[in-house]
Structure formats: C-alpha cells, structure tokens
C-alpha cells in the first residue's frame, strides 16, 4: 500500500462502506463483539450463581487478562508474519470451541455426569482459552484493516469500527441478560454460539492477503523492533500513554454502584441508566464523527478530549442530582469516544504495514492492563479517601496528565493529519 497516500479531499461518511471487504470486516467485528460481550455477562452471572463468592467473579477477569496480556507481543509477531484471514479463522474457531464446551457443561443432562464443583474450574479454563485467542485477535484485526481499505479512509474506518464496537458492547450485555432471565443459561449459550458462527461466516467473505512481513531475524529481535518503534515515535507513545493514564485514573465507572445505591439513592434501575448514559454518549458522538471528523488538528483535539473527559469525571463525582449525573456520564462517554477515534487513526496512520501486528500488541498491553488496574485504583482510593474524593482525585489526575503531555508535545498541536503523515513524528 502506498504510504504517501493521505486525505486530499473530503470523502462522504459512507465512503468506506463501499468496500465489500470492509463491510464483511465490520460484520465480523460486530457479531463477534456482540457474542463476546454477551458471554462476559453470562459467565459472571453463572459463576456467581454457583459460588455466591465475589472473589470468583474477580478470578474470571484474571483468567482472561493474564493470557491476553502475556501473549500479546507474540500474538503481534504471529499476526505480522501470517495471512490474516487464516489466522482469524483459527482464532474464532478456538473461541467457538471454548463456548461450545461451556454450553455443554451448563446443560441439565451434563449435571448428572459432572459434579457442580467441577463446572466453575472448567469455566475458568475456557475463559483462559478465550484470553489466549484475544491475544491474537487484536493485532490480527488491526493489521487486516490496513490491507482492505486505502489509507485516505483510515479516519472514517476507525470511526465506523469504533462505533460498531460500542454498539455491540451496549446491545450484547443487554441481550445476554434478557435471554438469560427469560430462557436460562443453556439457551443463551446457543445464541452466543450462533453469533460467533455468523462472525465466522463473515471471515469467508474476506480475501486472502499475503503477509507484508517476512522475518529475517530472531523472534526476540522482531518483538523488540515493535516495542522500539513505539517508544521512538513521539506521537504514538504520547497517545498510548494518554490512554493508559486516563483509563487508569479515570476508572471511576467501577464506582457507579456506590453512587447509585449510597449517594443518588436510585437503586439498580438507576444504575442501569447510569451505565447506559456513557455508552450512549459514545455511540452518538461516533455517529456524528462519521460526518464531522475531529482529525483537522488531531493532537490538539485529543488533548482537549482527554481534558474534557477528566472534567466530566470530576463533576460527576461532585453531583448530587441523578439527572445531572446522567448528562455528565453522557459527556464522559462522548469525550472518550473522540479520543478513541483520534488515537486509533494515529496508530493506523503512523504504523508501517509490516509492523502493524507488533505495534497493536504493544498497544494491547498498554490498554489491556490499564482497564483492570484502573478499576482496582478506583476501588483502592475509594477505600482510602472515600468515594467522592476518589473520583475527584481520578479526574484531576487525568487533567494533570493531559496538561503535562501538552507541555511536552506543544509543537504537535498545530499539525494537521496530512502533516503528521508526512513527518511521521
């Protein structure tokens, strides 16, 4: 692909959808994410139903996070040197098998053969397997997108990609909870497997693209090249660091149940609206960005978005009104979605085709760890300094990180997207 190709004139917001492969790619991502998010909710429900132990829920996340983060760099190396369509077929088939095993162990017939005490360890093992697949999934999909669309459409492809992910992340848990409540665990797993199968079918509509990276040195040196590239690129390292620290300090969403029950007194119904507010803000903003792109001066807009994200967190922490809190959570999701689009576009634009898997793997290690640790940080600070001060502290630190980044990268705020591509800063 020509690395000098960049935006010369505006394309319509639907331009990227004219590419059949991208439509198949988008369908694959949506249906897989839908099934994945359904399954995440259902596994949590089922494990807690069997154990009545909150620690067991924490172990579910740990069983997935450890292999996903641990294998990320190797997954990026494999993604770079492999044909992406074939790799994704193997990854999705592995997830399909893990889900099938969980379906089998939850059927009433199997309860006569498998003691209840064995079911939870089997679930943990299957979640561990899905975590391994996740370590290959992110770098493979990131690398593939660059092979199916021209470079000038990267900003729009990132917007559509993130929008479909957000939409699936909202609808998946909602559908999972409803189906589980009305029809039970087994039927829910049948639905999950159906959606995974649909995503598998979408892969068959993708063309086979030869890898752009042929390793000529040891695997250790190849992996090191990906890490070194990120740390030498000022803008890419800054974008990843901003994401890491904003998620780490801005993980106040983990404290929503405390606000719903103890501060706003709105109960579980209000909690549902609070969780939906941020996601709704993100989805609507992403849809707007398919028409009005934030990529005029991306680095400046990224810093503004992160600052707005931190400010909305502070205000949400101080709010005593339920409806004002919903507005602030909506704004938090909106600002976050802007930063997501800009970061993903910068990554697509600055990463050489033969290093996309490894660079995506480094990004996954940054982000994959920050979500879990951010939730832990919010819980720990809430215990040490109480809930409201903890949220205000997190938002303040997010703004501080954005301010420090601005001082260190002031020269980047004036660059347009085309200038960033030309300078590859």
Question: Which role does the model predict for each range below?
Answer:
Residues 7-67, 228, 232-278:
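Helix-loop boundary and gating motifs at the non-cytosolic
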Residues 30, 114-136, 244, 312, ...:
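Hydrophobic core of transmembrane alpha-helices in multi-pass small-molecule transporters
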Residues 43, 136-149, 338-351:
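Intracellular juxtamembrane helix-capping segments at the cytosolic ends
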Residues 54-55, 151-161, 268, 353-363:
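Loop-to-transmembrane helix entry/capping segments in MFS-fold secondary transporters
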Residues 70-74, 81, 85-97, 101, ...:
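C-terminal transmembrane bundle of multi-pass solute transporters/carriers
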Residues 117-119, 166-202:
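Helix-loop-helix hairpin linking two adjacent transmembrane segments in secondary transporters
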Residues 126-167:
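Cytoplasmic helix-loop-helix junction between adjacent transmembrane helices
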Residues 143, 147, 189, 193-218, ...:
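Helix-loop junctions on the cytosolic side of multi-pass membrane transporters
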